[in-house]
């Protein structure tokens, strides 16, 4: 009995010391604050929308209203259409000039994550349609795994990597290598535009 108790006590002491050596897994600031700081650091103009789920990923979108197109849609009574099946028909050649114009410009899509794998899984699918970025806590960028696995993948997919220090100050660690490359315009990009347009109007109304 005494031997078992001693081993348990020793293991508990080791676990406690290990926990003190590990950095906190909590983010240094709220997701919304870190996302806004990252958008500013990257020079993304527009509104930083609340976190939303797109393509099954939890991301933060930065977008701006296209004033002329928005005004035209108001005049036509063309509200945002979030139904993906409906929007998929808007790119058909026979509907050219007969569908509402895109009313927002997506400046970027980012993920605020505790681990780089989560961040890249969330943002890489959007790289075809917008600039992308991942914000990580500072300690996540100090690991061997980050250096040998994360950085090469981020370069390959053109994802900006940023880190947040314990005070929540965000710095750019790795800029995108795909800046200026043309973005795809297809049924998915048109649908993303409509969903973001809908969220943009909801956000503006809520803050009014």
What are these regions (language model features)?
Residues 93-98, 139-141, 146-208:
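Non-catalytic C-terminal interaction segments of nucleic acid-processing enzymes
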Residues 1-94, 199-208:
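Acidic-basic catalytic patches of nuclease active cores, encompassing PD-(D/E)XK
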Residues 36, 84, 118-121, 183, ...:
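Alpha-helical protein-protein interaction elements
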Residues 51-55, 60, 125-136, 141, ...:
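A broadly tuned "polar low-complexity/structure-edge" signature
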Residues 80-157:
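Catalytic cores of nucleic-acid endonucleases
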């Amino acid at each position: 009995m005494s031997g078992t108790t001693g081993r348990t006590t020793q293991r508990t002491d080791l676990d406690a010391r290990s926990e003190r050596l590990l950095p906190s897994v909590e983010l240094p600031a709220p997701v919304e604050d870190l996302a806004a700081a990252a958008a500013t650091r990257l020079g993304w103009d527009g509104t930083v929308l609340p976190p939303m789920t797109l393509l099954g990923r939890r991301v933060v979108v930065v977008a701006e209203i296209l004033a002329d197109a928005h005004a035209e849609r108001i005049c036509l009574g063309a509200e945002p259409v979030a139904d993906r099946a409906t929007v998929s028909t808007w790119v058909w050649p026979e509907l050219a000039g007969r569908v509402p114009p895109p009313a927002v410009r997506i400046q970027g899509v980012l993920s605020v994550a505790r681990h780089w794998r989560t961040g890249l899984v969330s943002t890489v699918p959007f790289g075809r349609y917008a600039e992308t970025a991942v914000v990580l806590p500072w300690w996540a960028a100090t690991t061997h795994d980050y250096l040998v696995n994360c950085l090469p993948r981020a370069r390959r997919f053109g994802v900006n990597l940023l880190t947040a220090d314990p005070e929540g100050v965000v710095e750019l660690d790795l800029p995108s290598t795909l800046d200026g490359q043309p973005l795809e315009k297809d049924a998915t990009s048109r649908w993303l535009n409509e969903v973001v347009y809908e969220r943009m109007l909801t956000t503006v109304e809520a803050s009014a």
